[in-house]
Amino acid sequence: EGKPHVAHTKNLVPFLVIDPLSNAILKPENGSLQDIAPTILNILNIEKPALMTGKNLIQEHEFGEHRHVLLIILDGWGDGFPNESNPIFVGKTPFWDELHQIYTFSQLKASGEAVGLQVGKAGNSEAGHMNIGAGRIVPQDDVRLDHAMQDGSFFGNEIFNQAIEAVTRNKGKLHLIGLLTEKSSHGAIDYPLALLK
C-alpha cells in the first residue's frame, strides 16, 4: 500500500554491543533474544545459571572486572525491508544511521519458535521481554494451551471442570470471554471453542 506498517512482524531485530573502555569494534554473533541475558552476564563476569540455555554472543573479547551494563531495548524496532512500508526506513533516524556506519550489528530472531510462540507467529513485546530476561526460550500461553489440548490435559483442568460442573449442577449459565480471532498474538478463537467441548 506504500504506507508504513506498524503491526507485529517476523523481522529479525538488530543487536549491538559497545565497550566504551575499548577501541575494538565488537561483532556479536547472530542468535535469538534468549542470548541477550547470557551475553550480559558474560560482560559482568557472572556465571550463567544452568536454566539459561541461551549463549554468549560475544566470544572473543575480554571485558575485564567490575563492569556495568546499560541495556537499551528499542521495542518494535526490527530490521524491516528498506521500502515505504518500513517506518524506521521512512523516518529520520540520524543517530541510528550513524551507529550503523560505525559499529557492527548482529541480528536476533524475535518471533515464532525462537521466542516460545507457534511456528511462524509474529513476535510481540511480552514474548520478547520474557525471553530476554530468562535467557532461555519461554513457551508462551498459546503454545502451552495447544500442547495441553493435544495431550488432553486441557480437558482435565480441575478449575475448568469444577466451573462447568457447578454450572451444570445449578442449571446456571457459563460466560466465556476470549479473543475471537485467528491472527492475534494475544489469543485465538480455538481456546474458548475447546472449552465448549
Can you annotate each of these PLM segments?
Residues 1-197:
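Feature captures the catalytic ectodomains and active-site-proximal regions of enzymes
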